[in-house]
Amino acid sequence: AGLYYRLSAYCYPLRRVDTEEHVEDGFVPGADFADVVALYEADRKLRTLIHDGMERIEVGLRSRLTSLLCRDNALGYQERRFYRSGFDLDGWLRTARRRVDRAGAHNTAIDHYKKQYGGQYPFWVLSEVLDFGDVSKLYQGLTYKAQAQIAETFGITIDLGALSKNERKIVRRRHPLASWFEQLTIVRNTCAHHGRLWNKSFVPASTKYVRTIPGLESLPDGQSERIYGAV
């Protein structure tokens, strides 16, 4: 039953549809079960490739956040000056504490800082036990200036001068890269749990302000919610 459920989503686009748009049991002409298996295998290989690529993005974001937040103080990530007024920093720190408790004595660095420094963890130590979703949420909470600084190191530069007043307001409220990190968090978790990527919708990520960046011209217009944009 489990295997049938996993394959059923790959079957659906290949099944016949009657004149009243009802899906029938048989395949469309020219398609058979071998095509379903081929789609499944292609998706499995895509998951492997994306999971490998996501590691580089995760490590890159962690290191950039460390450089920004710990420039003057190893515990700088706890300072509100880096964040938007509406960001729930206390809530985020509670989540981080749960990640530390989860790692416990199994993480040598965490154990060392707990015993020697009373549980005051530099961000470069803390970040190693955070989920990518935690790191992504921290980026979303940063001021626009801080977000833009990190985005530029990823090659994402938004020319505010070329935007209208309303567009600038939209971008400052939520940097486009924040929505991409949110989408990539879901993509990453889908890969980690061997879920389906093909023909699936994810949290939409805005493309309006990044399609002018060299290499990103082929992104869908407006927003991207399929795996093509994430790749």
Please provide the spans of the model-predicted regions.
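Long, contiguous internal "core" modules enriched in hydrophobic/ aromatic residues
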Residues: 1-231
